[in-house]
């Protein structure tokens, strides 16, 4: 099908999101199979899933990068992004949600809402992404559809409304009643569940289904209060309501985020996936439903609102970079307005750099087809962009617009890395540079004292996988040190400094004079450097050099050399020398000045605090809580159900190394835990002294 046949209202940009083992990739695989994109279904546990295309993903059976793919169903074009469920990869989820219009949340019928599902759900709330839910693995021992729906309401605050009623469960799961069409769907075993037949609702379920349908209709009546005709029908004659009417109100409720309809099935057994595809098209929004996108006009500084129209000015967001051994650097983009043509010259307005597009590709996991253009609403990939990274805006050269950025969290864990041989040094530098372009939560820095290269990321698994990729994709052999906590430094009061950098060594000297004021910035806002120089006391051409010097000075703190965060620096005064001043002198002076000001601003060390969730049998609860307290943990709350307790706590990362091993021995291997970065907090004085001594 060519793209011209699809209006904007027939495009669906959706994500599939879930906890690590809820069966998300399997669900996506089945969608690809039924929508005719793969001829043989890939199985995750055989390591053959189409969407899990990196070697490490196939070995570990988890999805690391969000693969993007396009399928066609019911006359609509669906772009699907499969997101990872492991907490170390939350930036992948965050950046795919930013460019989606709707999502399918997959839950495990046995465990319902798990800790990672909460994280992903919160991220989707942040971007206002409409969601429908799919309760998967209905064929597993202990599957409980209504229990899963209840846990969505309790733990996520979701308005979860069943639209299915399962027929049987565990090994007896044979199909479901569709509460909208009031038909029972039985999957035919001889087609491995790919086909089904419609029958009347079985007698033993009729009463339950009538109650559930009434609850569904009453809920829908509150979604659209302006639709009085629908409300009257619900109250007076619910049987006269047509399927079409229900779909219309349901679509409105889903798009406005007022309702989360819940379907059930077993993707692995092919049950319920086609029903899921139907409602993706019927209920989830098109780019038109999501409305205008906001941006800032760089020339005027004013907010602009861009209509989703293919004739409007170009505005696209780069949301992922991938390095491909054959094509080189691939940039994934979402187009919010306008049309992007192959070979065109465009502007990266975030970096103020011109770019040229050499090829446009439509992706299917890691297969690709060339395209001549992408237009509004499309998600696609471009080759040829040199400067663009995640979160950058691409626009027409004469229309300088910047879209809202994708925020990357600060890394929490560091490792030293060095090449095994001298010959690997160059290759290692290239590999680190390529990987940090792809992944904004992976940072590379140099320890000033030891000269070691330090890599930083969101957790041990994150850095492990990146190390694997270096060996496989870049053929680099490297040794890594033990994981260390990524501390930061900040200041706690306002201060100022006046610094002169003067060198006279025969011939031309060096002269720079800079006065700074610094103050603590809001937590999480990052560093800001502004120039308040007036009257040319420092000439305009030297200001960028001062700013660069200040930024470099902030890279290593004054207590223990950790990077400074949340510091606001104002360059307020200075002077220069006609002959001896240079960019170099002002850069060095800027760096010295900010260090001097920080020393006087009561600097402190910050440490990453993790949100830890432990699920443990109740008889081990006391031991688990005692152990978390010993690790300087702050218990946030606990809840119990079915002899299992869930504890949530905030614990410093430095106390959590090797936690899984000690948790196993505390609970005889029966407890599980997840951990995600929460925020940075001030280190207690005694521990700060120990860190500084090191």
UniProtKB/Swiss-Prot annotation:
Cellular component terms (Gene Ontology): cytoplasm
Top-level division of the source organism's lineage: Bacteria
Q: Which GO terms describe its molecular function?
A: GTP binding; GTPase activity; translation elongation factor activity
The record's section on PROSITE patterns has: G_TR_1, G_TR_2
Keywords, A to Z, come to:
Cytoplasm, Elongation factor, GTP-binding, Nucleotide-binding, Protein biosynthesis
GO biological processes? ribosome disassembly
Where does the record place the tr-type G domain? 9-288
Q: To which protein family does this belong?
A: Belongs to the TRAFAC class translation factor GTPase superfamily. Classic translation factor GTPase family. EF-G/EF-2 subfamily.
Q: What is this protein called?
A: Elongation factor G
């Amino acid at each position: 099908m060519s793209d011209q046949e699809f209006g904007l209202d027939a495009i669906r940009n959706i994500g599939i999101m879930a906890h690590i083992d809820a069966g998300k990739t399997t669900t996506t695989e089945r969608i690809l199979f039924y929508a005719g994109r793969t001829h043989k279904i890939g199985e995750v546990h055989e390591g053959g899933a189409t969407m899990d295309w990196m070697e490490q993903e196939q070995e570990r059976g988890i999805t690391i990068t969000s693969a993007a793919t396009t399928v066609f169903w019911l006359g609509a074009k669906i772009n699907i992004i499969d997101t990872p469920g492991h907490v170390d990869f939350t930036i992948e989820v965050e950046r795919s949600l930013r460019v989606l219009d709707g999502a399918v949340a997959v839950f495990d019928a046995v465990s319902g809402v798990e800790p990672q599902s909460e994280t992903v759900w919160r991220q989707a709330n942040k971007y206002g992404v409409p969601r429908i839910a799919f309760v998967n693995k209905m064929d597993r021992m202990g599957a409980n559809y209504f229990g899963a729906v209840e846990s969505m309401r309790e733990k996520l605050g979701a308005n979860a409304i069943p639209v299915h009623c399962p027929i049987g469960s565990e090994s007896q799961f044979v199909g479901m009643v569709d509460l909208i069409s009031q038909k029972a769907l039985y999957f035919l075993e001889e087609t491995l569940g790919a086909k089904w037949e419609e029958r009347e609702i079985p007698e033993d379920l009729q009463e339950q289904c009538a109650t559930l349908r009434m609850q569904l209709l009453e809920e829908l009546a509150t979604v659209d209060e302006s639709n009085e005709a629908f409300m009257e029908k619900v109250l007076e004659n619910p049987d006269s309501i047509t399927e079409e009417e229900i779909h219309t109100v349901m679509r409105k409720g889903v798009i406005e985020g007022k309702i989360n309809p819940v379907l059930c099935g077993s993707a692995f057994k092919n049950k319920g996936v086609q029903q899921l595809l139907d409602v993706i098209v019927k209920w989830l929004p098109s780019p038109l439903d999501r409305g205008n996108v906001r941006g800032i006009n760089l020339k005027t500084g004013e907010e602009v609102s861009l209509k989703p129209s293919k004739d409007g000015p170009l505005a696209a967001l780069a949301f992922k970079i991938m390095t491909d051994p054959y094509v080189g650097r691939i940039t994934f983009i979402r187009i919010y307005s306008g049309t992007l043509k192959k070979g065109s010259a465009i502007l990266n307005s975030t970096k103020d750099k011109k770019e040229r597009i050499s090829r446009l590709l439509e992706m299917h996991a890691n297969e690709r087809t060339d395209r001549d253009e992408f237009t509004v609403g499309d998600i696609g990939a471009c080759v040829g962009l040199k400067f663009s990274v995640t979160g950058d805006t691409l626009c027409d050269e004469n229309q300088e617009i910047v879209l809202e950025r994708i925020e990357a969290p600060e890394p929490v864990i560091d490792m030293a890395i060095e090449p095994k041989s001298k010959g690997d040094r160059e290759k290692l530098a290239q590999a680190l540079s390529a990987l940090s372009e792809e992944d904004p939560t992976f940072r590379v820095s140099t320890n000033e004292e030891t000269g070691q290269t330090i890599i930083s990321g969101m957790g041990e698994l994150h850095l492990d996988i990146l190390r694997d990729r270096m060996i496989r994709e870049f053929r680099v052999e490297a040794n890594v040190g033990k994981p260390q906590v990524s501390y930061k430094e900040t200041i706690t009061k306002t201060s100022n400094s006046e610094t002169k950098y003067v060198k006279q060594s025969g011939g031309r000297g060096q002269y720079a004079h800079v006065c700074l004021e610094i103050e603590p910035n809001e937590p999480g806002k990052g560093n800001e450097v502004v120039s308040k120089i007036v009257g040319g006391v420092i000439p305009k051409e030297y200001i960028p050099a001062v700013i660069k010097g200040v930024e470099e000075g902030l890279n290593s703190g004054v207590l223990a050399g950790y990077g400074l965060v949340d510091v606001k620096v104002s360059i307020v005064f200075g002077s220069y020398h006609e002959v001896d001043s240079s960019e170099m002198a002002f850069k060095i002076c800027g760096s010295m000045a900010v260090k001097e000001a920080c020393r006087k601003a009561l600097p402190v060390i910050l440490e990453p605090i993790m949100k830890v969730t432990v699920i443990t049998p109740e008889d081990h609860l006391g031991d688990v809580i005692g152990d978390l307290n010993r690790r300087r943990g702050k218990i946030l709350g606990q809840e119990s159900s079915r002899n299992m307790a869930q504890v949530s706590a905030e614990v410093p990362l430095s106390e959590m190394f090797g936690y899984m091993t000690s948790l196993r021995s505390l609970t005889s291997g029966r407890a599980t835990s997840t951990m995600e970065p929460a925020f940075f907090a001030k280190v207690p004085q005694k521990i700060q002294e120990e860190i500084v001594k090191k």
